[in-house]
Amino acid sequence: MLKTYQIIGCSAGVPTQERGVSSVMISTSNFDMMIDCGEGTYLRWQKAGYEWKNLKFILITHMHPDHTGGLIPFLFYRKLFSIEHTLTLIGPPQLETFITDGFQNSGLSNDQNYSWIDISQNPELNLQAGVKIRTMKMKHKIPCWGYRIEDSSKSLVFITDTLATSNAVELAQNSDVLIHEATFTHDMREKAAEHFHTTNIQAMEIADKARVKRLVLTHFSPRLSDGIIQEWIWEGQPCVIFDERQEI
C-alpha cells in the first residue's frame, strides 16, 4: 500500500545551499523506492531518516547529471554497508552501462546484488505487494520517462524535464498526487520551450486536464527564490513542499 512521499531534492540543473537536485522518496507499507538520484541525495536521504533495509527500487527518469549525479556515490555507500538484499534499478537503456562504467573507471568492484530493468522495453511493471508502475515517454532533449506508481487504491505520478505534453495528462489522469516539474515561471515560457521544460502555469494546466487531487511542483530554476515559489497555489493548496513526508 502506498503511504508517503517526500521531495528530497527540487533544484533544476545545479544544487543550491538550500535545495538539492532531483530526488523523491516514496514509501509503501512494505518497501521504499527512490525516483532520481541527483548530486548530494545520499546526505539528504540519510538526514530524512530512511534506511537501507527498506530501499528496494531506484527509478531513473533520464540520464542528465542533475538526476543521476548522486547515483554512483549512493550505490558505493550501499556497498560499504554490505547490504545484501536485491536492489532493482529501473531506467533508460543506458543506465546499466552508466553504473558499470562508473564503478570500473573508479577502480571499484561492482559486486552488489542488483537487477536491471530497461524502461524502454518494459512500460508496465508489477513490483511488490500489489504496487505497479506504468511509464510514458515525455518530450525532452534526451529520452525521458514519467512514472505512475499505484496500488489498488492510490496513485502518484512523477513527471520531470519535459515540455507540456498530452502524455503527461494521460499518465496523470485522476491520480491522487502529481509531482510535476516547474523549471520556469510562465513569463519565461519561450525559454522553457527552448530548453524542453515546463512553466508553473503549464504544470497547473496539466493538473487541471488530468483531474488530479493534489499537485506538487518541483525542479525549480535556482534563479527562483523560495519567496516566489511558495506563493504558487493550485486549487487552494500550496504547490511547493520542502523536506516533509506527505501522505499520498
How would you describe each model-predicted region?
Residues 87, 92-144, 241-243:
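Metallo-beta-lactamase
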Residues 1-48, 144-160, 177:
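Conserved beta-strand hairpin/beta-sheet module of binuclear metal-dependent hydrolase folds
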Residues 34-38, 56-66, 92, 156-162, ...:
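Active-site neighborhood of phospho(di)ester-bond hydrolases with catalytic His/Asp-centered motifs
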Residues 163-245:
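Cap/insert and terminal regions of metallo-dependent hydrolase folds
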Residues 15-17, 120-186:
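Active-site-proximal loop/helix segment associated with metal-binding centers of metalloenzymes
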Residues 4, 86-88, 176, 213-214:
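Residues at the starts of beta-strands that form the adenosine-phosphate
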Residues 70-77, 102, 225-232:
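Metal-dependent catalytic neighborhoods of phosphoester/phosphodiester hydrolases
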Residues 40-90, 118:
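Active-site metal-binding motif and surrounding structural segment of the metallo-beta-lactamase
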